[in-house]
Regions:
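Short linear motifs at protein or domain termini
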Residues: 1-99, 209-221
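Short arginine-rich
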Residues: 201-211
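Short secondary-structure boundary/capping segments
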Residues: 61, 170-172, 192
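Solvent-exposed loop and edge beta-strand segments that line ligand/cofactor-binding
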Residues: 165-169
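Hydrophobic side chains within alpha-helical segments
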Residues: 37, 53, 89, 93, ...
Length: 221
């Protein structure tokens, strides 16, 4: 069935806002006002309401009676749970993927890692990091697991983005990525699983620290 123009518009608004939330262009707590968004995207309120409803359903926005819709905050506990989900699933994905990775797959991942090392814009770093991991996990042939990981990454995105602004974190990540590729090339599925688990857990600790710092800052203000 062909989508209506309103559905197409809603999808476009949703994808744009989702990307802006995931990359912290729209920070937690930022208001998502229907009038402003309708004017910005040149659409009626109908597709905007649909897009906002989808963001709320995805856990990316919060709708409060008489207060409108805003970008959702994550509690430290919610972040921990999402990180636990990620390391469990990503560890399993790489474990399943390693036996099926060809030299061409490794070469493609290496190319992405080379691009990542040269990237200077945080947006580009974020995108290439995602593509690097996704290129490896795809060989696991577990679309539902991958979908769950993508959902968790999306919900963490507004906080995942911040660690990439630190050169120390970028350098550490580069070392871990190169080690992961060596393990994949050697066919060491268990070693790769352990490396991915360590990588995700470390990132998770940074995110929880950021959330706690923001919470303290709000309390002080």
């Amino acid at each position: 069935m062909k989508e209506s123009s309103s559905q197409v518009a809603a999808g476009s608004v949703y994808e744009t806002l989702r990307s802006e939330i995931a990359t912290a262009v729209l920070e937690p707590g930022a208001p998502l006002k229907q009038d402003h968004l309708a004017a910005r995207f040149g659409v009626s309120h109908v597709p905007v309401r649909e897009a906002l409803s989808r963001l709320v359903a995805a856990g990316l926005a919060t709708a409060r009676l008489n207060k409108g819709t805003s970008v959702a905050f994550l509690s430290a506990r919610e972040a921990v749970e999402l990180i636990e989900l990620r390391w469990l699933l990503e560890g399993r994905l790489i474990e399943l993927a390693v036996p099926h990775l060809s030299r061409a797959d490794i070469a493609r991942a290496t190319g992405l890692l080379d691009e990542l090392g040269k990237a200077r814009q945080v947006e580009e770093v974020f995108r290439l990091n995602h593509e690097f991991h996704a290129s490896l996990y795809a060989k696991a042939d577990r679309p539902l697991l991958l979908q769950s990981v993508e959902s968790a990454r999306l919900n963490l995105g507004r906080y995942l983005y911040l660690p990439w602004k630190s050169k120390t974190n970028v350098d550490r990540s580069e070392v871990e990525h190169k080690k992961l590729l060596r393990l994949c090339l050697a066919g060491d599925a268990q070693g790769a699983k352990a490396m991915v688990t360590e990588h995700v857990i470390h990132t998770g600790k940074l995110i929880v620290e950021i959330i706690e710092q923001q919470k303290t800052s709000v309390a002080i203000d």
